[in-house]
UniProtKB/Swiss-Prot annotation:
Lineage: Bacteria, Bacillati, Actinomycetota, Actinomycetes, Acidothermales
The species this protein was found in: Acidothermus cellulolyticus (strain ATCC 43068 / DSM 8971 / 11B)
Entry's Gene Ontology cellular component terms: ribonucleoprotein complex; ribosome
Protein name per UniProt: Large ribosomal subunit protein bL9
Encoding gene, per UniProt annotation: rplI
Disulfide bonds: none
Database matches in HAMAP family: Ribosomal_bL9
Length: 149
């Protein structure tokens, strides 16, 4: 089944991409959640026009993403979390927690889906987190997890 994505879908692509998926995945997941629309010839032409306009904006976005990367990498992010003896956290730090900590530290609001954690953060200390700002630009943010008082 050919579909046009209306939102970013992990493993498939971004908005405007024409993708070929299995019928069940498209019919039961992508279409009901409005993540995609059927790929008719008229819709494909319209998407091509939108993509051309997006390419012009993307050059500008790439410069903004690079500036944002520099800002994020220089930002000291401290995240207070409840911890027991030995420095182990009760639970773990989620991408949503990191996005809130970056915003509280004076950074921009980040989409939690763009934050990639290599493994669960369950200890106090400094941890490296990757933030995908643009398909070509990623920022590595140092998050200092401290015990909450």
């Amino acid at each position: 089944m050919k579909l046009i994505l209306t939102q970013e879908v992990a493993g498939l692509g971004g908005p405007g991409d024409v993708v070929e998926v299995r019928d069940g995945y498209g019919r039961n997941y992508l279409l009901p959640k409005r993540l995609a629309m059927p790929a008719s010839p008229g819709a494909v032409k319209q998407v091509a026009l939108i993509k051309r306009a997006r390419e012009v904006r993307e050059i500008r976005d790439l410069d903004q993403a690079r500036a944002l990367r520099d800002q994020l990498e220089a930002l000291p992010v401290t995240l207070p979390a409840r911890a027991g003896s030995g420095g182990r956290l009760f639970g773990s730090v989620t991408p949503d927690d990191i996005a809130a900590a970056v915003h509280a530290a004076g950074g921009p609001k980040l989409d939690k889906r763009r934050i990639e954690i290599s493994g669960p953060i369950k200890t106090i200390g400094s941890h490296q987190v990757t933030v995908r700002l643009h398909p070509e630009v990623s920022a590595t943010v140092s998050v200092e997890v401290v015990p909450a008082s």
